[in-house]
């Protein structure tokens, strides 16, 4: 019985070692995400991206583009999507965000207070749908343009979430799953999320004594 018990221990340790080896091999084989998207992007049909099971017969080109790639990366979110964007007026990007929200993905948005009510802003529709939105309360701009997908991938660059930026301007987005970089952006988002908590706003600041 004692010998059999020892063999069970040895077999268990061997199985654990094999599992760890397989895990390490998988991690080494996993291709890191290192990608750059450049804009402007050609106008293409995005319906197959948003709804892959539906057919679309619109006259727009049904081809890949930097914009469709951006949508695909965002729609990968399974648990959470944190957006920190200066201005958000692109209806197609709003559709993607609302689609994630409808799937139960936790979506949080931080934006600039001066631009959230600008003409064409999508912040109102997002809030109406129940998406959590916070904004700054300062004279300086909240000028970030980044997104964190599931806490594992960061999309960051010069791109404002506007039609002009995606279709007209020279812009870029860097995508990476580097853990150090993702952690830094996640921490910055959480820091701003707490800083912009409406409960901490001073709506009636006292005038300085002169």
From Swiss-Prot:
EC number: 3.1.-.-, 3.1.4.-
Membrane topology: Single-pass membrane protein
Topology, Mitochondrial intermembrane side: 1-6
Active site residues per record: 143, 145, 150
Chief subcellular location: mitochondrion
GO molecular function, one term: metal ion binding
Domain PLD phosphodiesterase: 138-165
InterPro entries: PLD-like_dom, PLD_domain, PLipase_D/transphosphatidylase
Compartments where located: Mitochondrion outer membrane
Presence of keyword Magnesium: no
Transmembrane segments annotated in the record for this chain: 7-24
Keywords assigned by UniProt, alphabetized: Differentiation, Endonuclease, Hydrolase, Lipid degradation, Lipid metabolism, Meiosis, Membrane, Metal-binding, Mitochondrion, Mitochondrion outer membrane, Nuclease, Spermatogenesis, Transmembrane, Transmembrane helix
Superkingdom: Eukaryota
GO cellular component: mitochondrial outer membrane
Annotated CDD domains: PLDc_vPLD6_like
GO biological process, one term: mitochondrial fusion
Membrane side Cytoplasmic: residue ranges: 25-210
Catalytic reaction list: a cardiolipin + H2O = a 1,2-diacyl-sn-glycero-3-phospho-(1'-sn-glycerol) + a 1,2-diacyl-sn-glycero-3-phosphate + H(+)
Function: Presents phospholipase and nuclease activities, depending on the different physiological conditions. Plays a key role in mitochondrial fusion and fission via its phospholipase activity. In its phospholipase role, it uses the mitochondrial lipid cardiolipin as substrate to generate phosphatidate (PA or 1,2-diacyl-sn-glycero-3-phosphate), a second messenger signaling lipid. Production of PA facilitates Mitofusin-mediated fusion, whereas the cleavage of PA by the Lipin family of phosphatases produces diacylgycerol (DAG) which promotes mitochondrial fission.
Subunit annotation: Homodimer.
The record's note on its domains: In contrast to other members of the phospholipase D family, contains only one PLD phosphodiesterase domain, suggesting that it has a single half-catalytic and requires homodimerization to form a complete active site.
The family this protein is said to belong to: Belongs to the phospholipase D family. MitoPLD/Zucchini subfamily.
Record's protein name: Mitochondrial cardiolipin hydrolase
Species for this entry: Xenopus tropicalis (Western clawed frog)
Lineage: Eukaryota, Metazoa, Chordata, Craniata, Vertebrata
């Amino acid at each position: 019985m004692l010998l059999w018990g020892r063999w069970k221990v040895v077999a268990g340790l061997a199985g654990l070692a094999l599992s760890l080896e397989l895990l390490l091999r998988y991690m080494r084989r996993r291709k890191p995400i290192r990608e750059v998207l450049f804009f402007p992007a050609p106008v293409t049909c995005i319906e197959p991206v948003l709804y892959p099971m539906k057919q679309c017969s619109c006259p727009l080109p049904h081809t890949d583009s930097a914009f469709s790639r951006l949508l695909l990366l965002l729609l990968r979110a399974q648990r959470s999507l944190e957006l920190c964007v200066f201005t958000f007026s692109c209806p197609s990007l709003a559709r993607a965000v609302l689609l994630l929200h409808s799937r139960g993905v936790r979506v949080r948005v931080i934006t600039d207070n001066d631009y959230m009510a600008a003409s064409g802003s999508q912040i109102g529709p997002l809030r109406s749908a129940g998406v959590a939105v916070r904004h700054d309360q300062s004279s300086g701009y909240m000028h970030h343009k980044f997104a964190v997908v599931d806490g594992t991938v960061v999309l960051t660059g010069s791109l404002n979430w506007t039609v002009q930026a995606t279709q007209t301007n020279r812009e870029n987005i860097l995508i990476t799953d580097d853990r150090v970089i993702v952690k830094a952006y996640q921490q910055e988002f959480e820091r701003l999320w707490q800083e912009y908590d409406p409960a901490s706003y001073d709506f009636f600041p006292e005038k300085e004594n002169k």
